[in-house]
């Protein structure tokens, strides 16, 4: 019979510290153990109170081509559409405004929105990788300020402001700690990616919760890291242990054809591939892909 593909969502409630099979997992503060043989089906009402759909207003100004980023701040949804403009909607889906009219080649106009932040004062900060600038606009889309970015901040796929001075800039191979005051990268951390292995999730690996910053690799790494802003370092925080189903990226061979890495997830029975990791103040959620043995 055909193999059965399982996409599982877990809400772990118990954390037990123990040793695991790779260095990152051994250093993690918490280890969460899963026995995939005992996986049980859960009904959605068991862990959520309600689910509802918010239809977004549709007009010529609010059409969305491709959602590449989403933030929900002070009851307003902000959507990064195809890295070109930011659209905002209220909690009922009513269209508020778009930064599209600010996009261009003029002196106070941005050209590309790789990522954005909504600042504490409600202003929008746009990371423009093509013009090499950080732009700030107020809630009425008026130009506030801009600053030039040095060449070494690129390439970049996302950025997150963690203080008035420090931004974390993410790309495929590194995290860069950038000082707005000094206008330079203070430190760069190389990420333990396996070259060629495809990203399972498109979501940004940077998550901010209660002034803490977490980072998750986009490839199927089973470690969730915590970012130490003062030391500008990554610390293994949660390790997810699937026993015999563990995947250790560091054990994969190097310099094989790209097709090997692209097909690795679907070609390996019995291995649990972590797809995404989320942390909140009340729960920790993990989604994974596991291909069961043939039956």
List each model region and its residues.
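Blade-loop segments of beta-propeller domains
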Residues: 58-61, 95-120
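Short coil/turn segments at the loop-to-beta-strand junctions that recur within blades
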Residues: 60, 100-107, 149-156, 191-196, ...
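C-terminal motif of bacterial Sec signal peptides marking the signal peptidase cleavage site
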Residues: 18-19
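Residue-level detector of conserved catalytic or cofactor/ligand-binding positions
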Residues: 286-295
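A short helix->beta-strand "capping" segment at the edge of beta-propeller domains
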Residues: 38-63
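Asp-box/WD-like beta-propeller blade repeats and closely related beta-sheet repeat scaffolds
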Residues: 129-171, 189-195
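Repeated scaffold domains used in trafficking and secretory/extracellular systems
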Residues: 66-69, 110-115, 153-161, 198-205
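Residue-level detector of Asp-centered blade-edge/turn motifs that repeat once per structural unit
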Residues: 72-74, 118-121, 161-164, 209-210
């Amino acid at each position: 019979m055909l193999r059965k593909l399982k996409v599982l969502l877990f809400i772990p409630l118990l954390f037990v510290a123990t040793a695991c099979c790779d260095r990152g997992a051994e250093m993690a503060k918490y280890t969460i153990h899963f026995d995939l043989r005992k996986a049980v089906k859960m009904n959605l009402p068991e862990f959520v109170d309600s689910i509802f759909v918010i239809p977004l207003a549709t007009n010529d100004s609010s059409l969305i081509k491709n959602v590449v980023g989403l933030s929900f701040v002070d009851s307003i949804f902000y959507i990064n559409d195809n890295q070109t403009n930011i659209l905002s909607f209220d909690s009922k889906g009513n269209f508020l405004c778009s930064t599209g009219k600010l996009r261009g080649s003029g002196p106070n106009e941005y050209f590309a929105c790789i990522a954005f932040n909504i600042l504490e004062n409600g202003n929008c900060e746009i990371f423009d990788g093509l013009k090499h600038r950080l732009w700030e606009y107020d809630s009425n889309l008026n130009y506030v300020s801009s600053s030039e970015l040095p060449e070494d901040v690129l390439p970049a796929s996302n950025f997150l402001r963690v203080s008035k001075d420090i931004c974390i800039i993410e790309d495929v191979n590194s995290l860069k700690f950038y000082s707005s005051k000094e206008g330079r990268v203070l430190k760069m951390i190389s990420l333990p990616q396996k070259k060629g292995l495809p990203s399972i999730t498109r979501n940004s690996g940077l998550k901010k919760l209660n002034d803490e910053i977490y980072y998750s690799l986009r490839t199927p790494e089973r470690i969730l890291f915590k970012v130490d802003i003062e030391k500008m370092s990554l610390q293994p925080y949660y390790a997810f242990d699937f026993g015999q189903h563990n995947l250790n990226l560091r054990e994969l061979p190097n310099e094989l054809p790209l097709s090997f890495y692209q097909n690795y997830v679907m070609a390996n029975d019995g291995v649990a591939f972590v797809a995404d990791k989320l942390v909140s103040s009340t729960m920790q959620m993990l989604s994974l892909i596991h291909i069961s043995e043939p039956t």
